Amino acid sequence: MALWGGRFTQAADTRFKEFNDSLRFDYRLAEQDIVGSIAWSKALLSVGVLSAEEQQKLELALNELKLEVMEDPHQILRSDAEDIHSWVEQQLISKVGDLGKKLHTGRSRNDQVATDLKLWCRQQGQQLLIALDRLQSQMVQVAKQHQGTVLPGYTHLQRAQPVTFAHWCLAYVEMFERDYSRLSDALQRLDTCPLGSGALAGTAYPIDREQLAHNLGFHRATRNSLDSVSDRDHVMELMSVASISMLHLSRLAEDMIFYNSGESNFIELADTVTSGSSLMPQKKNPDALELIRGKTGRVYGALAGMMMTVKALPLAYNKDMQEDKEGLFDALDTWNDCMEMAALCFDGIKVNGERTLEAAKQGYANATELADYLVAKGIPFREAHHIVGVAVVGAIAKGCALEELSLQELQEFSDVIDNDVYDILTIESCLEKRSALGGVSPKQVAYAVDQADKRLAQRDSSAVKVRPARLTDIETLEGMVAYWANMGENLPRSRNELVRDIGSFAVAEHHGEVTGCASLYVYDSGLAEIRSLGIEAGWQGQGQGSAIVNYLVDKARQMAIKKVFVLTRTPEFFMKQSFLPTSKSLLPEKVLKDCDQCPRQHACDEVALEINLVEQIIQRSHVA
């Protein structure tokens, strides 16, 4: 079903239809399209286009469709729909009949796709932040283990000065820190909602676009309808961030390939990230790293292609803009995969400390120390530089290191050299002297490792903000609880109940907007239940639920509660939070009284899980 048939008297040529259709790649926006449609149905309700009964019917059908898509996303590809918007509308009409045709009132595919894409970018961006964090954390852990492992530092691929393996790791941690910052900034800039901008001139209905934006989890609505449907800055910015980060990953891969080579033999990669040769049985090839290096080009290509596509477009939507998605999807998928592989390479890495130390002692890497020694004796640096250069030539001629020259031989180059020169030519001295901030001295490296560890820990603690609920949150809580109750995931709660139990609720926040909630209901037996866990549409899969559950479990622990349980149809989620399966028959009868309100009470498919806080305390005390 096309969404634009009335103007045409002839059917589209099948070759044009195949050329024009985008469902084969924009099917990835299905969840976002459904979430956006639910929010739009609420907006239409607010201006009287839909009745409350119609809106509820549409929302239930869209939620059903969302679950179907989550279970089998590839079912979409079996359709001949033009794009994901057409497919969603087709499915909706098949569920609710002509009512489904009312949903597109006041909305254009132009603002619809712009909204879908921003929702997808926001969700994918959060996953990329997590991937960056994991990679940095893995590298910091390796750095902790190798603070004293000496490594030759290179310039022009020539041995230059000794560093440590930890210092080398932290150099890339800094690069990825900048990537994290750039991505965070990009996500803030795209945190505006274009829905309600229509085709280009805005919607003709008096919709509260700020409320609509907040319902979708955006910070605010966009300010200009023409810009809203024209804008693809966020696509190019995310590709740009990906390109810079892939550059860092490629440089990392190149370093590790060199260090892993037989000529260097500084590191050995695990079998899990290497492959062999079909002909040469001795080979162990660093394929994961080579692919990271190779895939960098495709991300650059996607960015260049997108910029060339947009550079001469007039304002508003043009069909050229359909080309934004394939490159974006591929670029961000590639970036995510490469970060995962890089972290995996560090997971099983072995560092040959003896070999790295041996290499660091070669190549006259202590020549700069001798020059600094001469400067300390009163010789101008430029002259000292020349003297040491001549000394290096002399040592090369004798086939020895600088520190292996006798005092008499060294004094042939400068008579200010004395016996104390040998102390400053050691590797330990070379490292120790670099004690300024950011240097390679043991103290500075230990400080840098500690600071990196603290930054990552602070980031983890502030990624999702959870706080006690307030009465000012009631409107949002009521909407979220009703949403998941309609989905059949939670029991319904009246507004009066929510007000009465507000002290038991915790909420997650994003830019001051509530994005998730749950309550901790305490029984008089020292037992507590997590209830009414729900995440705002568009925010699932971004750590909100985990953060709320952990917050409530910590609260229960502080209250000396012995056990926390939950009844759920998604046991996998709670098992990731350390909950274990239990039997519903072991729960007190009064726990199950609320089941009388459940529409599925006669065909219950909920699973009981629990976390025993007393056992955790005992285990921790044994460890201590």
Swiss-Prot record:
It catalyses: 2-(N(omega)-L-arginino)succinate = fumarate + L-arginine. Residues 464-614 form the N-acetyltransferase domain. InterPro entries: Acyl_CoA_acyltransferase, Arg_succ_lyase_C, Argininosuccinate_lyase, ASAL_AGS_AcTrfase, Fumarase/histidase_N, Fumarate_lyase_CS, Fumarate_lyase_fam, Fumarate_lyase_N. GO terms for cellular component: cytosol. Residues 1-466 are annotated as: Argininosuccinate lyase. Disulfide bonds: none annotated. Residues 467-624 are annotated as: Probable acetyltransferase. It is found in: Cytoplasm. PROSITE patterns: FUMARATE_LYASES (PS00163), GNAT (PS51186). One of its GO terms (biological process) is arginine biosynthetic process via ornithine. The keyword Amino-acid biosynthesis applies. It comes from the Bacteria. Pathway: Amino-acid biosynthesis; L-arginine biosynthesis; L-arginine from L-ornithine and carbamoyl phosphate: step 3/3. Its EC number is 4.3.2.1, 2.3.1.-. GO terms for molecular function: acyltransferase activity, transferring groups other than amino-acyl groups; argininosuccinate lyase activity. Keywords: Acyltransferase, Amino-acid biosynthesis, Arginine biosynthesis, Cytoplasm, Lyase, Multifunctional enzyme, Transferase. In the N-terminal section; belongs to the lyase 1 family. Argininosuccinate lyase subfamily. This is Bifunctional protein ArgH. It comes from Vibrio parahaemolyticus serotype O3:K6 (strain RIMD 2210633). The lineage of its organism: Bacteria, Pseudomonadati, Pseudomonadota, Gammaproteobacteria, Vibrionales.
